[in-house]
Swiss-Prot record:
InterPro entries, sorted: Cgr1-like (IPR005579)
Name under which the protein is recorded: rRNA-processing protein cgr-1
Any one GO cellular component localisation term in the record: nucleolus
Keyword Ligase appears in the UniProt entry: no
Source species taxonomy: Eukaryota, Fungi, Dikarya, Ascomycota, Pezizomycotina
Annotated Basic residues bias: 103-123
Organism: Neurospora crassa (strain ATCC 24698 / 74-OR23-1A / CBS 708.71 / DSM 1257 / FGSC 987)
Length: 123
């Protein structure tokens, strides 16, 4: 019986030690002042559910912004690609016109067909 009372006394002493840890002497010597705590004026004002909801809304907005940005980038790339194709076509046309000045029309047509076949095979 005495062993159970001593164990309850030791557990209560351990609990009090865990709760109130002695801080020791203050460096500045003002032991009569209360120990300072972290200044958090905003803590506890907004609930966790509200913060979680705000985060969710922010994530949705970010996703929408990313979607719009990607869409805009895709449109830009499409325009650039179309412009490159147009320039390449124009360049090829000019090259054939230059060839036509020097060669006969029928021969230029044959070369065109031959080059198109090679393009199809290579691509």
């Amino acid at each position: 019986m005495s062993s159970t009372t001593t164990t309850t006394q030791t557990t209560s002493q351990v609990e009090t030690k865990a709760v109130s840890k002695p801080l020791g002497m203050r460096v500045n010597g003002k032991q009569w002042h209360a120990p300072k705590k972290a200044f958090r004026p905003g803590s506890g004002l907004t609930s966790y559910e509200k913060r979680a909801k705000e985060r969710q809304l922010l994530a949705a907005v970010k996703a929408k912004e990313k979607e719009l940005k990607d869409e805009k980038e895709a449109e830009r790339k499409r325009r650039i690609e179309a412009l490159k194709e147009k320039r390449a076509k124009k360049e090829e046309k000019e090259r054939y016109e230059k060839m036509a000045e020097k060669m006969h029309k029928k021969r230029v047509e044959r070369l065109k067909r031959k080059e198109k076949r090679n393009k199809l095979i290579n691509s």
